[in-house]
UniProtKB/Swiss-Prot annotation:
Family listed: Belongs to the tetrahydrofolate dehydrogenase/cyclohydrolase family.
Organism in which the protein naturally occurs: Acetivibrio thermocellus (strain ATCC 27405 / DSM 1237 / JCM 9322 / NBRC 103400 / NCIMB 10682 / NRRL B-4536 / VPI 7372) (Clostridium thermocellum)
A GO cellular component annotation in the UniProt record: cytosol
Amino acids binding NADP(+): G165, R166, S167, S190, I231
Identification of the protein by name: Bifunctional protein FolD
Statement: the UniProt record of this protein carries the keyword Amino-acid biosynthesis: yes
TM region(s), chain numbering: none
Pfam families for the chain: THF_DHG_CYH, THF_DHG_CYH_C
Keywords attached to this entry: Amino-acid biosynthesis, Histidine biosynthesis, Hydrolase, Methionine biosynthesis, Multifunctional enzyme, NADP, One-carbon metabolism, Oxidoreductase, Purine biosynthesis
Pathway(s) served: One-carbon metabolism; tetrahydrofolate interconversion
SUBUNIT field: Homodimer.
CDD domains, sorted: NAD_bind_m-THF_DH_Cyclohyd (cd01080)
């Protein structure tokens, strides 16, 4: 059987269209969502991501403010800019494009963002709220994955869910969101023994390790839903995920493609968080 393709591009377009209508309504009530995007240095991949975030803002009607800083910007200068944006009423959400240059401490920079404007949901306050099951914002990639799982039609309750990868950005919050939906969750990582056997138990498999085609079809339970968060460029310039698509799609019941799966959903969820931030801030005034 051929797996159902979970098309993140189509789903993200639908979400953005709904947000566009919501933003039009908010503007009638004088609530104008705005997203400040900070990029330090000129990493080409970061530039691509920033451009797609700005494009999504334009499609929805969210005002975007870009701050492109030189590679040699100091940590103090960056934090000073963040403090300024924290106080700026035109800015509902602040996003610092990662990775940052080596001389800047990412943790300190994330801590500087006002939690009510932290639309990436990386601040410890937002991480803590997620842990106790009362989040204001959901981390964008895991939230996008949850929407794709919903699209697959599988009910998470009681299912074996395996997350491969334990990063703060994807793996850990992913496990929390699956747990919140009553999944039975196992997290695997580089030190996990018999990783293939663990993956084979999964009804829902989410892979986010940054290793090209790391999980093969032979490690997948027949009929599983497979979500591939990875995006890796091979030497021949081809983009592939962390799952070997060809072999996996013959075993899974549903699978995300790379590109066009999780990536567009991450951006749609960022937009959703920015709109929510604008609404929460309007209530606080």
């Amino acid at each position: 059987m051929e797996a159902k393709v979970l098309n993140g591009k189509e789903l993200s377009t639908k979400i953005k269209e709904e947000l566009k209508i919501e933003v039009e309504d908010l503007k009638k009530n004088n609530i104008n969502p705005g997203l400040a995007v900070i990029i330090v240095g000129n990493d080409p991949a970061s530039r691509v991501y920033v451009n797609s975030k700005k494009k999504a803002c334009a499609e929805i009607g969210i005002e975007s403010f870009e701050y492109a800083l030189e590679e040699n910007t100091t940590q103090e200068e960056l934090i000073e800019l963040i403090h300024k944006l924290n106080k700026d009423d035109k800015v509902s959400g602040i996003l610092v494009q990662l990775p940052l240059p080596k001389h800047i401490d990412e943790e300190k920079v994330i801590y500087a963002i006002d939690p009510s404007k932290d639309v990436d949901a990386f601040h410890p306050v937002n991480v803590g709220k997620l842990m106790i099951g009362n989040p204001d914002f959901l981390p964008c990639t895991p939230a996008g994955v949850m929407e794709l799982i919903k699209e697959s039609g599988i009910d998470i309750t009681g299912k074996e869910c395996v997350v491969v990868g334990r990063s703060n950005i994807v793996g850990k919050p992913m496990a929390m969101l699956l747990l919140a939906q009553n999944g039975t969750v196992t997290v695997c990582h580089s030190r996990t023994q018999n990783i293939d056997e663990v993956c084979k138990r999964a009804d829902i498999l989410v892979v986010a390790v940054g290793k090209p085609e790391f999980i093969k079809g032979s490690s997948i339970k027949p009929g599983a839903v497979v979500i591939d968060v990875g995006i890796n460029r091979l030497e021949n310039k081809k983009l592939v995920g962390d799952v070997e698509y060809e072999s996996a799609s013959r075993v899974a019941s549903a699978i995300t493609p790379v590109p066009g799966g999780v990536g567009p959903m991450t951006i749609a969820m960022l937009m959703k968080n920015t709109v929510k931030a604008a609404k929460l801030q309007a209530k606080m005034k």
